Amino acid sequence: MKQRPRSKEKDFMIRFFPEGGQLVEGVPSVVAFEATSKEEGTVGISGTVYGPDDVELTQFTTLHDGMGCFTYTPTDKQAKAVVTYQDKKYSFQLPKALPHGYVLNVASKEKALVIKVLRNSTSLKDTLALFISHQGRPLMYQTIDFKDQTVYHLPLSTQGLPRGVIQL
């Protein structure tokens, strides 16, 4: 009789989720995270992000159900997050940043969404398209031309938007 393979799940881990899907060198990014324990599920933690030469970049803490976020500007060197959980220190590598690309950032302000598309100076000056949809139905289309700027701002009124998940 074959035995089942042992679970390779670690005792404690943190997963990182850069807003917009990726980190880009030199572009400030919001990074969400989830901390989980094999035995407890989601857990509350706090920690510190360190850059090259162990320089402290930012601190972070969970907000709810093991999840939280922090703002971080990546470089060409990979950063690490250090946390203490149950009196034991853990170190996790943040995702590697791309040398060029785009970052999408969305913030909710009074009756509006503030959408920012950011790029670093080495990224191509492409014209991009931003599609906004709800339940697979297009709501809006916006062409983005950076010209010589690295940030494109698009305020979007929430009045008239349907309830539920809006996809960008």
Report each predicted region and the residues it spans:
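N-terminal, cleavable Sec-dependent signal peptides of secreted/periplasmic/extracellular proteins
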Residues: 1-167
